[in-house]
Regions:
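Hydrophobic core segments of alpha-helical transmembrane domains in multi-pass membrane transport
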Residues: 16-28, 57, 100, 129-134, ...
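Transmembrane alpha-helical segments in multi-pass inner-membrane proteins
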Residues: 223-224, 229-230, 240-306
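Loop-to-transmembrane alpha-helix initiation sites
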Residues: 12, 121-123, 170-178, 219, ...
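Transmembrane helix-bundle core of multi-pass membrane transporters
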Residues: 122-192, 218-221, 241-249, 324-325
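Cytosolic-side transmembrane-helix boundaries in multi-pass membrane proteins
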Residues: 1-21, 25, 203, 209-217, ...
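Membrane-helix/interface signature in polytopic inner-membrane proteins
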Residues: 39, 183-223
Length: 325
């Protein structure tokens, strides 16, 4: 076997892609409902905000950090934006921009707490998680405008509907935007100074500082990027969820973070891939969507997802030990 073939077969992204194919085959065989177009469309709808959060949190995880505020933050921004649209007649486009601005602001706060004030990432983002959860709880349940209402056009960003009634055809336009974003952020991670410095800080922060990298600045920036994508996730969440409910963000960050680790980000930092994040999120979404079709309910879904995450992290640890030897 050539070195190139060995490299492909040992690439965790390739392994996870095989897992996606295997899971799809198993669920399709066990349930004909799983094969329906509406099921696939629904799975894609609810993967958009998970993927956006996951793309953002990939960068702090590569530096050896984490952001626990992305789930509650996403719901908080969607609630604030929706409340302004419903109660204050703020244009939807302004509310969408506000979601992004709020995400960047909380991301910058996380970055300052971690990168400049040297708080542990877990503690700093746990604090902002509590802040955003509390701020979101001050708002009531908020439906954004639906597709047939003024301002409801933003739903078409993620799902294009052609025709009316039963003859209407729906296309997952959001999937195209997700692929383009993955390509863009993979390029940023691998071919820009920001991406190279992010990897360098995760590999060895002290060595990165000695080489002239402004570690504090780039630590702040990875959390700003994470906040930006959390704000975008808030828009996607509002677009696919009929009503944004306070308190629903708790735990959503686990799917995003889990998908990043399944996709091959190093448990200790220093390496990651946005393409890997994409395939990792699809494993999580396949499990969440497919397991109910084979008779396994929510508790079992969480258990199996947890086991998959443990296996992914163990594989990464074994690979690190093997490369060290």
């Amino acid at each position: 076997m050539t070195k190139k073939k060995k490299s492909i077969l040992s690439d965790q992204r390739f392994i996870v892609l095989l897992v996606i194919i295997a899971l799809s085959a198993v669920f399709s065989f066990m349930s004909k409902e799983f094969r329906q177009y509406t099921t696939i469309l629904s799975m894609l709808d609810f993967s958009y905000y998970d993927l956006l959060m996951a793309i953002g949190v990939t960068f702090p995880l590569i530096t050896g950090g984490v952001d626990l505020s992305i789930g509650t933050g996403m719901v908080c921004y969607a609630l604030i934006g929706g409340t302004l649209v419903r109660s204050n007649n703020v244009p939807v486009v302004v509310a969408m921009l506000l979601c992004v601005v709020l995400g960047i602001a909380i991301g910058a706060l996380n970055g300052v707490l971690i990168g400049i004030m040297n708080l542990p990432p877990f503690l700093a983002t746990l604090c902002t998680c509590m802040i955003t959860r509390g701020a979101g709880s001050l708002c009531s349940a908020t439906p954004w405008p639906t597709l047939n209402q003024p301002g409801g056009w933003f739903h078409s960003i993620f799902k294009l509907t052609i025709g009316q009634g039963r003859s209407a055809s729906r296309y997952p336009l959001g999937f195209l935007w997700m692929i383009l974003l993955v390509i863009l952020m993979e390029f940023v991670l691998n071919h820009t100074k920001f991406g190279r410095y992010t990897n360098a800080i995760g590999s060895n922060k002290e060595a990165a500082a000695l080489s002239g990298i402004n570690v504090k600045f780039y630590h702040v920036m990875v959390y700003v990027v994470c906040g930006l994508f959390t704000g975008l996730a808030a828009i996607a969440y509002a677009a696919v969820t009929p009503t944004v409910q306070p308190g629903t963000g708790a735990g959503l960050e686990m799917d995003a973070i889990g998908g990043v680790f399944v996709g091959g980000v190093a448990a200790s930092g220093g390496y990651g891939s946005v393409v890997g994040t994409l395939v990792g999120i699809f494993v999580i979404m396949l499990l969440k969507t497919g397991l109910p079709y084979v008779g396994l309910q929510a508790n079992w879904q969480q258990i199996i997802t947890g086991v998959v995450l443990i296996v992914a992290v163990l594989i990464d640890i074994l690979k690190e030990k093997k490369s060290a030897h």
